Swiss-Prot record:
CDD domains: Chemokine_CXC. This is C-X-C motif chemokine 9. The keyword Disulfide bond applies. Residues 91-125 are annotated as: Disordered. One of its GO terms (molecular function) is chemokine activity. Cytokine that affects the growth, movement, or activation state of cells that participate in immune and inflammatory response. Chemotactic for activated T-cells. Binds to CXCR3. Its main location: secreted. InterPro entries: Chemokine_b/g/d, Chemokine_CXC, Chemokine_CXC_CS, Chemokine_IL8-like_dom, CXC_Chemokine_domain, Interleukin_8-like_sf. It is found in: Secreted. Belongs to the intercrine alpha (chemokine CxC) family. Residues 1-21 form the signal peptide.
Length: 125
Protein backbone atom coordinates (compact mmCIF):
# COMPACT_ATOMS: atom_id res chain seq x y z
CA UNK A 1 0.00 0.00 0.00
CA UNK A 2 2.86 2.39 0.80
CA UNK A 3 4.40 1.94 -2.67
CA UNK A 4 1.16 2.53 -4.53
CA UNK A 5 0.48 5.96 -2.94
CA UNK A 6 3.48 7.74 -4.58
CA UNK A 7 2.67 6.02 -7.87
CA UNK A 8 -0.95 7.15 -7.65
CA UNK A 9 0.09 10.73 -6.81
CA UNK A 10 2.57 10.72 -9.71
CA UNK A 11 -0.10 9.64 -12.18
CA UNK A 12 -2.48 12.32 -10.91
CA UNK A 13 0.27 14.95 -11.15
CA UNK A 14 1.09 14.00 -14.74
CA UNK A 15 -2.54 14.07 -15.86
CA UNK A 16 -3.31 17.40 -14.19
CA UNK A 17 -0.20 19.20 -15.43
CA UNK A 18 -1.09 21.35 -18.43
CA UNK A 19 1.20 21.72 -21.38
CA UNK A 20 1.98 25.34 -22.22
CA UNK A 21 3.50 26.71 -25.36
CA UNK A 22 2.95 28.72 -28.49
CA UNK A 23 0.93 26.98 -31.17
CA UNK A 24 2.87 26.31 -34.36
CA UNK A 25 -0.16 27.20 -36.47
CA UNK A 26 -1.08 30.89 -36.47
CA UNK A 27 -4.87 31.03 -36.31
CA UNK A 28 -5.90 28.22 -38.60
CA UNK A 29 -6.28 30.30 -41.73
CA UNK A 30 -4.44 32.74 -43.98
CA UNK A 31 -3.71 36.14 -42.48
CA UNK A 32 -3.68 37.87 -45.86
CA UNK A 33 -6.91 37.78 -47.83
CA UNK A 34 -6.03 40.62 -50.19
CA UNK A 35 -2.61 41.98 -51.09
CA UNK A 36 -1.87 45.66 -51.65
CA UNK A 37 -0.63 46.65 -55.07
CA UNK A 38 1.07 49.87 -53.96
CA UNK A 39 4.80 50.09 -53.35
CA UNK A 40 6.09 50.65 -49.82
CA UNK A 41 9.22 52.70 -49.22
CA UNK A 42 11.83 50.83 -47.12
CA UNK A 43 12.30 53.83 -44.80
CA UNK A 44 8.62 53.74 -43.80
CA UNK A 45 8.86 50.09 -42.67
CA UNK A 46 8.92 49.16 -39.01
CA UNK A 47 8.83 45.39 -39.51
CA UNK A 48 8.52 42.88 -42.33
CA UNK A 49 7.33 39.36 -41.55
CA UNK A 50 7.43 36.51 -44.00
CA UNK A 51 5.39 33.34 -43.39
CA UNK A 52 6.04 30.18 -45.38
CA UNK A 53 3.15 28.02 -46.61
CA UNK A 54 1.66 25.81 -43.91
CA UNK A 55 -1.13 23.23 -43.60
CA UNK A 56 -3.53 26.03 -42.65
CA UNK A 57 -2.54 28.36 -45.52
CA UNK A 58 -1.10 27.32 -48.87
CA UNK A 59 0.27 30.77 -49.77
CA UNK A 60 3.48 32.52 -48.79
CA UNK A 61 2.43 35.58 -46.81
CA UNK A 62 4.39 38.80 -46.37
CA UNK A 63 3.05 41.28 -43.83
CA UNK A 64 4.60 44.75 -43.73
CA UNK A 65 4.16 46.90 -40.62
CA UNK A 66 4.67 50.61 -41.18
CA UNK A 67 6.08 53.07 -38.65
CA UNK A 68 2.62 54.63 -38.29
CA UNK A 69 1.23 51.23 -37.18
CA UNK A 70 -0.62 50.26 -40.37
CA UNK A 71 -0.18 46.73 -41.71
CA UNK A 72 -0.28 45.67 -45.34
CA UNK A 73 -0.10 42.29 -47.02
CA UNK A 74 2.27 42.19 -49.97
CA UNK A 75 2.25 39.95 -53.02
CA UNK A 76 5.39 37.76 -52.77
CA UNK A 77 5.46 37.20 -56.54
CA UNK A 78 6.00 40.86 -57.47
CA UNK A 79 9.61 41.82 -58.30
CA UNK A 80 9.24 45.07 -56.31
CA UNK A 81 8.33 43.09 -53.19
CA UNK A 82 11.27 40.73 -53.70
CA UNK A 83 13.57 43.75 -53.92
CA UNK A 84 11.96 45.23 -50.79
CA UNK A 85 12.64 41.97 -48.91
CA UNK A 86 16.30 42.06 -49.99
CA UNK A 87 16.68 45.67 -48.84
CA UNK A 88 14.96 44.90 -45.52
CA UNK A 89 17.22 41.89 -44.86
CA UNK A 90 20.25 44.04 -45.72
CA UNK A 91 19.13 46.69 -43.19
CA UNK A 92 18.50 44.07 -40.49
CA UNK A 93 21.91 42.46 -41.05
CA UNK A 94 23.61 45.86 -40.97
CA UNK A 95 21.92 46.71 -37.65
CA UNK A 96 23.00 43.35 -36.22
CA UNK A 97 26.60 44.00 -37.25
CA UNK A 98 26.51 47.45 -35.66
CA UNK A 99 25.16 46.03 -32.40
CA UNK A 100 27.72 43.25 -32.42
CA UNK A 101 30.53 45.73 -33.01
CA UNK A 102 29.38 47.93 -30.14
CA UNK A 103 28.97 44.93 -27.89
CA UNK A 104 32.54 43.72 -28.22
CA UNK A 105 34.32 47.00 -28.83
CA UNK A 106 36.79 47.78 -26.08
CA UNK A 107 38.05 51.28 -25.56
CA UNK A 108 41.52 51.86 -24.25
CA UNK A 109 41.92 54.84 -21.98
CA UNK A 110 45.18 56.71 -22.31
CA UNK A 111 46.09 58.99 -19.42
CA UNK A 112 46.66 62.61 -20.37
CA UNK A 113 50.12 63.99 -19.73
CA UNK A 114 50.36 67.50 -18.35
CA UNK A 115 52.65 69.98 -20.07
CA UNK A 116 54.91 70.29 -17.06
CA UNK A 117 55.57 66.54 -17.09
CA UNK A 118 56.53 66.36 -20.75
CA UNK A 119 60.24 66.16 -21.50
CA UNK A 120 61.52 69.47 -22.79
CA UNK A 121 62.68 69.66 -26.35
CA UNK A 122 65.93 71.50 -27.03
CA UNK A 123 66.15 73.77 -30.00
CA UNK A 124 69.05 73.06 -32.27
CA UNK A 125 70.36 75.90 -34.36
Amino acid sequence: MKKSAPLFLGIIFLTLTGVQGVPAIRNGRCSCINTSQGMIHPKSLKDLKQFAPSPSCEKTEIIATMKNGNEACLNPDLPEVKELIKEWEKQVNQKKKQRKGKKYKKTKKVPKVKRSQRPSQKKTT
